[in-house]
Amino acid sequence: MKKIGLFGGTFNPLHNGHLQLAEFAAAQCQLDQVVFLPAASPPHKKGDEIVPFSHRAEMIRLACSRNKRFSCNTIEQDLARPSYTVDTLQALKTSPLYKSEAQFFFLIGVDAFIELKTWKAYRDLLSEINFILCPRKLFSRTQTVLFLTELGFVQTPLGWEHSSYLTLYELEGAPDQVSSTEVRRTFEKSGDLYQKLPPTVADYIMKHGLY
């Protein structure tokens, strides 16, 4: 069975940290493919801070072109707004692209994961997809452990297991993550994009005058 990692996010813009994390998760969790899912209208983000979907999707395509395991899926563009992960997952599972059997893994930062109870139908998500928890800079693992325990998960040699939900996995030794917000602030202060972005993405931003 093919193992597909789903990497959802605003990607405003996609940066080197996103790619490094995807590569790390693919290696550690033996993923056959990592699909980047740009959010069309994320419910927890301010719309006036986000560049149009078409630009964000194109930047992802450019960045993924050098890795055959990476791809961009723009399914959220055609779904109801705002973008809810549970709806995106259901649409993906019934799409022609993934109609064959596949095991899905959702990459998520631990800072976002501990807010899971605020997500639409979060119990359905835990029942239908394996989560891969990605560490975040300056974020205590103790908070993650407490939240998982509160949800009823038990840590085992295989991961975090639950009687009703699918197994969760923690990435070990993953690279520290910078945020897209930090990248934008660096650009505002110094005008330097090339340090933290793939060259093709930096070129695209300069060409179209984004941020």
From Swiss-Prot:
TM region(s), chain numbering: none
Q: Which keywords has UniProt assigned to this entry?
A: ATP-binding, NAD, Nucleotide-binding, Nucleotidyltransferase, Pyridine nucleotide biosynthesis, Transferase
Q: Name one Pfam family in it.
A: CTP_transf_like
Reactions catalysed, semicolon-separated, are: nicotinate beta-D-ribonucleotide + ATP + H(+) = deamido-NAD(+) + diphosphate
What Enzyme Commission number(s) does the record list for this chain?
A: 2.7.7.18
Does ATP-binding count among this protein's keywords?
yes
Molecular function terms in GO for this entry? ATP binding; nicotinate-nucleotide adenylyltransferase activity
InterPro entries on file: Cyt_trans-like, NadD/NMNAT, Rossmann-like_a/b/a_fold
The pathway entry for this protein reads as:
Cofactor biosynthesis; NAD(+) biosynthesis; deamido-NAD(+) from nicotinate D-ribonucleotide: step 1/1
Q: Which GO terms describe its biological process?
A: NAD biosynthetic process
Gene3D superfamilies the record matches = HUPs
Query: Which HAMAP family did the record assign?
Result: NaMN_adenylyltr
Q: Which NCBIfam families match?
A: cyt_tran_rel (TIGR00125), nicotinate (nicotinamide) nucleotide adenylyltransferase (TIGR00482), PRK00071.1-3 (NF000840)
Report the protein's function.
Answer: Catalyzes the reversible adenylation of nicotinate mononucleotide (NaMN) to nicotinic acid adenine dinucleotide (NaAD).
Q: Which family does it belong to?
A: Belongs to the NadD family.
Its recorded name reads Probable nicotinate-nucleotide adenylyltransferase
- Species of origin: Desulfotalea psychrophila (strain LSv54 / DSM 12343)
